[in-house]
């Protein structure tokens, strides 16, 4: 992994995206459905692309929106459709395009009051609250966001009535219908003008912000945070939660400083990520240099990505806490401080999350539910309360309300951030200090994720790796105990491989949203062992994708 000379430094002018050119390309570019890279493709979190590459243009948005209307009709989903969008430059035009199709199809659309930017968790929360107690007329939702991806990116997610990311069978249906519409030059897409859509009887306004903020007391112990007057800092990274944080501070009377309230779709205020891209990733020490530099001003600080479904935790004692480490801390704390959760509520993790989570679950006597990458695999369990917590290595998590009922079934960056404040106030230690106590008791993991460029063809080869392609019986000096191509929790394909020994493991898989592949590795022995794990994994992956 080659680190850019710009990494961790303020974004220079030459890296800033030309917003007028980008938006012009959104409207003028016409994708060719015969070219695979220009088709609609739902990854682990929706369809993403860039107008410059003909992978996220108005045609894509029109086609996906019509496909969703047809899916709703086929499934008998006829309640309101909650719509949110983030602060990326392409999100507002895409939201306008989507509304023109949704209104033409007679869908009751719930737009944010005052055209407020809306975080992903606020949409999931709204769907769940609306559908509670209903068996018909169910709501669903759309979020226009490419998450933490660079400023030139656009994205489109669909959340069905369970409030979580759409399952694979849903996205495949929508994807196929959208590509059919693209191939037919949008014949079959219903559309009215934006002015007509805004005035339509089916277009409504919804107060996402205050509904979400007022309900937080039912998932986080706000009294505990306020009672010790913690000094809290938050950097929304120019994202959709910019005004949510000030509302939270005011509503709950918290000593919370929003260190950056700027919204700028070039994201010029960011420090550059590892590869020379501007990427609003709250789990990256390169992208988070701004808040890390302020760590000593606060008892605990946090950040979220543009749609606020990911979190980053910064402490004065440890700086930026690695996502896996904070997941383990959160699980250990929550299951011992939520007495009204079901006694059989399980711990949800993905195959690339830390083995420390397994050890924490064992210590607190909770069942582990291990699934492929993708938060959609946690949605049903969070919905029915059989999962107390679901978390991903990429810093996405959600958990139940204090009474054990569902809060959100999509990733929520705000509640893990506020949980860091809750645990600091109640335990008198920040999350980094709590983590060190965990590792003293259970062992310290050394982990790394290596990202490398890969073409779509190479990603396809990697995704088809099978256990019989691993002929070695040893990995980094230890006997191989297990080779997985399917997750043990739900027996779903992981889209790659996970190879495990007594004190280490690696997993290799292609990214579902970017042209990269990822190797995850972890050792409970030390850095040298970790390095050996990565080297041997790299040999296997390079051999697979060079075929």
Regions found by a protein language model. Give the residues of each.
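Catalytic-core signal marking the mid-to-C-terminal active-site face
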Residues: 429-547
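An N-terminal, well-structured beta->alpha segment
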Residues: 2-104, 199-232, 240
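Ferredoxin-reductase
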Residues: 2-13, 76-164
